Swiss-Prot record:
Keywords: Cytoplasm, Endonuclease, Hydrolase, Metal-binding, Nuclease, Ribosome biogenesis, rRNA processing, Zinc. One of its GO terms (molecular function) is metalloendopeptidase activity. Its EC number is 3.1.-.-. It is found in: Cytoplasm. This is Endoribonuclease YbeY. It comes from Mycobacterium tuberculosis (strain ATCC 25177 / H37Ra). Its cofactor is Zn(2+). Zn(2+) binds at residues 118, 122, 128. It comes from the Bacteria. The lineage of its organism: Bacteria, Bacillati, Actinomycetota, Actinomycetes, Mycobacteriales. HAMAP family: Endoribonucl_YbeY (MF_00009). SUPFAM superfamilies: Metalloproteases ('zincins'), catalytic domain.
Amino acid sequence: MSIEVANESGIDVSEAELVSVARFVIAKMDVNPCAELSMLLLDTAAMADLHMRWMDLPGPTDVMSFPMDELEPGGRPDAPEPGPSMLGDIVLCPEFAAEQAAAAGHSLGHELALLTIHGVLHLLGYDHAEPDEEKEMFALQDRLLEEWVADQVEAYQHDRQDEKDRRLLDKSRYFDL
């Protein structure tokens, strides 16, 4: 799976974390593992321009998604022809997201993970224009975020245990004389 990230926002964010959450969601949603995704991070001025051009709405927004093909919820970009399929582009605005994160009382990283999940779901055909769609999409988004965080915690704990085991084994070598 290829995920390209271009950060033109001027804000330092963890691109590895964005890729991690996108990969997690794509895998959980059973998308073809050869799928490709592009992520672009913009400043508020550039995002406002994009928002006006594509949505005819003034001001910046947090996330926009541009799917390559229209998909229905549950649809998969795993066409029978060989080769990777392009899901589309996700555009994030970290500066705008930072304001939302502060208002919600969580970190920018948490907000960007949430917005990445939101963007991927849009690429897969989910929407929130109608109340029922919103309920379904936001519940799925929250569940995926919770599962990704749990996965990250488990990986961290596993890495810490591996490090402890390595140090213990290194110390035990002194007794093998």
